[in-house]
């Protein structure tokens, strides 16, 4: 990094756990380097599927208390990653998890996708103007895997960054197909893996040709795993004690813990961004 001003990174995520799943290593790396990291979460994740049987009465179709529980999970995950500035867009519970495409949750009065995109973008712009990040991260136009809240997060972040005079780069977080497939092959060699191995093409990933930026997070994987463990309702983490590790969501599909996290530069100067979100800025 060659910035003359203190570097500031802002990440916009849809639900608690997305910050750890998609960008946990990146957050931990930059936080450890002294970068001011701000995480903005758009909903409480009220519609998430719950893994531990003892907690399933928190579900949206039962007590509907999952969102509050996930606030505490997110707080613990942020602590594991070194984040000291976390904010909910519009405040706690302003917008609700919309659920997957075609579900009744899409029409909830507080559903994120049912809300005003302009109001949401304005709320985010206010945070951007307060924090003044040089770099902002969110999802691509498909939201990584098509979740309506991820797509809306992409839309409002794109709008807010376009209206901002302080953001120098906008990145989309993506997953490398080559590294994901290599990681899956390594998982197949592990004994006692408690999850189902992914089928070819089953895990969300993009062609490596579109990736512009690769961030080495190999020294921060333990922090990422601690953050993932904090999301106990959503993620199961497995480690074999010999360096092997994997995690799974409620579908029980094994996902590799990759040494790099990948991004596509959506706007801003490309020079220097290949290995550092801030590379070449301010020089």
From Swiss-Prot:
It catalyses: 1D-myo-inositol 2-acetamido-2-deoxy-alpha-D-glucopyranoside + H2O = 1D-myo-inositol 2-amino-2-deoxy-alpha-D-glucopyranoside + acetate. The keyword Cell membrane does not apply. Zn(2+) binds at residues 15, 18, 150. Coiled coil: none annotated. Binds 1 zinc ion per subunit. Its EC number is 3.5.1.103. Keywords: Hydrolase, Metal-binding, Zinc. One of its GO terms (biological process) is mycothiol biosynthetic process. GO terms for molecular function: N-acetylglucosaminylinositol deacetylase activity; zinc ion binding. Its cofactor is Zn(2+). Belongs to the MshB deacetylase family. Catalyzes the deacetylation of 1D-myo-inositol 2-acetamido-2-deoxy-alpha-D-glucopyranoside (GlcNAc-Ins) in the mycothiol biosynthesis pathway. This is 1D-myo-inositol 2-acetamido-2-deoxy-alpha-D-glucopyranoside deacetylase. It comes from Actinosynnema mirum (strain ATCC 29888 / DSM 43827 / JCM 3225 / NBRC 14064 / NCIMB 13271 / NRRL B-12336 / IMRU 3971 / 101). The lineage of its organism: Bacteria, Bacillati, Actinomycetota, Actinomycetes, Pseudonocardiales.
């Amino acid at each position: 990094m060659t910035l003359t001003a203190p570097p500031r990174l802002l990440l916009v995520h849809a639900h608690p756990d997305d910050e750890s799943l998609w960008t946990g290593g990146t957050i931990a790396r930059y936080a450890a380097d002294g970068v001011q990291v701000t995480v903005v979460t758009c909903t409480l994740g009220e519609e998430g599927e719950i893994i531990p049987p003892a907690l399933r009465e928190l579900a949206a179709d039962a007590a509907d208390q999952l969102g509050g529980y996930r606030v505490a999970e997110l707080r613990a995950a942020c602590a594991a990653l070194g984040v000291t500035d976390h904010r909910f867009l519009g405040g706690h519970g302003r917008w609700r998890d919309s659920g997957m495409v075609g579900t009744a949750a899409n029409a909830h009065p507080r559903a994120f996708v049912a809300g005003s995109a302009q109001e949401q973008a304005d709320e985010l712009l206010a945070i951007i103007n307060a924090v003044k990040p040089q770099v902002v991260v969110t999802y691509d136009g498909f939201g990584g895997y098509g979740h309506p809240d991820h797509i809306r997060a992409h839309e409002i972040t794109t709008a807010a960054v376009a209206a901002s005079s302080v953001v120098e780069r906008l990145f989309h977080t993506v997953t490398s197909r080559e590294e994901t497939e290599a990681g899956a092959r390594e998982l197949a060699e592990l004994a006692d893996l408690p999850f189902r191995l992914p089928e070819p093409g089953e895990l969300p990933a993009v062609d490596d040709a579109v990736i512009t930026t690769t961030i080495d997070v190999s020294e921060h994987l333990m922090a990422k795993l601690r953050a993932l463990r904090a999301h106990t309702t959503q993620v199961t983490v497995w480690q074999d004690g010999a360096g092997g590790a994997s995690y799974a969501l409620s579908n029980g599909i094994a996902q590799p813990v990759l040494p790099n996290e990948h991004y596509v530069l959506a706007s801003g100067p490309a020079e220097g961004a290949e290995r550092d979100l801030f590379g070449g800025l301010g020089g």
